[in-house]
Curated annotation (Swiss-Prot):
<keyword id="KW-0511">Multifunctional enzyme</keyword>
<keyword id="KW-0486">Methionine biosynthesis</keyword>
<keyword id="KW-0658">Purine biosynthesis</keyword>
<comment type="similarity">
    <text>Belongs to the tetrahydrofolate dehydrogenase/cyclohydrolase family.</text>
</comment>
<keyword id="KW-0368">Histidine biosynthesis</keyword>
<dbReference type="GO" id="GO:0004477">
    <property type="term" value="F:methenyltetrahydrofolate cyclohydrolase activity"/>
</dbReference>
<dbReference type="GO" id="GO:0004488">
    <property type="term" value="F:methylenetetrahydrofolate dehydrogenase (NADP+) activity"/>
</dbReference>
<dbReference type="InterPro" id="IPR000672">
    <property type="entry name" value="THF_DH/CycHdrlase"/>
</dbReference>
<dbReference type="GO" id="GO:0035999">
    <property type="term" value="P:tetrahydrofolate interconversion"/>
</dbReference>
<dbReference type="GO" id="GO:0000105">
    <property type="term" value="P:L-histidine biosynthetic process"/>
</dbReference>
<keyword id="KW-0028">Amino-acid biosynthesis</keyword>
<comment type="pathway">
    <text>One-carbon metabolism; tetrahydrofolate interconversion.</text>
</comment>
<dbReference type="Pfam" id="PF02882">
    <property type="entry name" value="THF_DHG_CYH_C"/>
</dbReference>
<comment type="function">
    <text>Catalyzes the oxidation of 5,10-methylenetetrahydrofolate to 5,10-methenyltetrahydrofolate and then the hydrolysis of 5,10-methenyltetrahydrofolate to 10-formyltetrahydrofolate.</text>
</comment>
<dbReference type="GO" id="GO:0009086">
    <property type="term" value="P:methionine biosynthetic process"/>
</dbReference>
<keyword id="KW-0560">Oxidoreductase</keyword>
<dbReference type="InterPro" id="IPR036291">
    <property type="entry name" value="NAD(P)-bd_dom_sf"/>
</dbReference>
């Protein structure tokens, strides 16, 4: 018997229904939420991501603001654009689409964002607030993972969660989210230096694969009935491919497809962060 699908698209649609109502209430009170994006260059993947985010905005009634810049812009020009959005009253929250061209400092750009307009939840100040468990915009992908598990009644409290990948956007903040008292999971954070990874994953109730290595998590690494969340994305023969081997579906109890699992929720919680920032004003 195959695993239950952790359907990110259906869950996203549920979130959008709620967001549309909340945006309507904000509009009635004279507060219109606005999401801005800064896109530098013409990377096809980045362009597609940005188009998708603005399409999502239209579905729930959030105002879209775009700042598309040429690939050869100077740091000063990028900084001016960030400062303009920091001061723009129509912009509730915004993101700098990554990756940036190599001559631009991504960390410096992210740090220049007003933490109160950090739609991605990745500003150093807001990551620090996550460590301290104080209110702040939460990183979108980790938040989406937790929501998806809850939506399908996968037990989190007391569960052993093995997270593969220590990146700033997923692995590190996910561990912080899952160990809050509201989640109460025990987290093992694995990476390229982890010895005997399979021994650890076979002990897990929940596995989150977020390394970007195609099909690296195989069926023999998964305990029967475990929940598996596939976050990593690679291109193989021109097609998007996740970190989880197809055979895992025959062993696991729940699996998120990739694409179609966590990705839609990352975008949904980007909008959620913007709506929440508007509600707090």
């Amino acid at each position: 018997m195959g695993a239950i699908t952790l359907d990110g698209k259906a869950t996203r649609d549920e979130i959008f229904v709620d967001l549309k109502q909340r945006v309507s209430e904000l509009n009635a009170s004279g507060r219109t939420p606005g999401l801005a994006t800064i896109l530098v260059g013409e990377d096809p993947g980045s362009q597609a991501y940005v188009r998708g985010k603005h399409s999502d905005c239209a579905k729930v009634g959030i105002t879209s603001i775009r700042r598309d810049l040429p690939a050869d812009i100077s740091t000063a020009t990028l900084n001016e654009t960030i400062d303009e959005l920091n001061a723009n009253p129509d912009c509730t929250g915004y993101i700098v689409q990554l990756p940036l061209p190599k001559h631009l400092d991504e960390n410096a750009a992210l740090e220049r964002i007003d933490p109160g307009k950090d739609a991605d939840g990745l500003h150093p100040t807001n990551l620090g607030r996550l460590v301290l468990n104080t209110p702040a915009p939460l990183p979108c992908t980790p938040r989406g993972i937790v929501h998806l598990l809850r939506r399908y009644d996968v037990p989190i409290a007391g569960a052993h969660v093995v997270v593969i990948g220590r990146g700033v956007t997923v692995g590190r903040p996910l561990g912080l989210l899952l160990t809050r008292r509201s989640e109460n999971a025990t987290v093992t954070l694995c990476h390229t230096g982890t010895r005997d990874l399979a021994t650890l994953t076979r002990q897990a109730d929940i596995i989150v694969a977020a390394v970007g290595v195609p099909h690296m998590l195989t069926a023999d690494m998964v305990r029967p009935g475990a929940a598996v969340v596939d976050v990593g994305v690679s291109r193989v023969d021109g097609k998007l491919t996740g970190d989880v081997h197809p055979d895992v579906w025959e062993v696991a109890g729940h699996v998120s497809p990739n694409p179609g699992g966590v990705g839609p929720l990352t975008r949904a919680f980007l909008l959620t962060n913007v709506v929440e920032l508007a509600e707090q004003r």
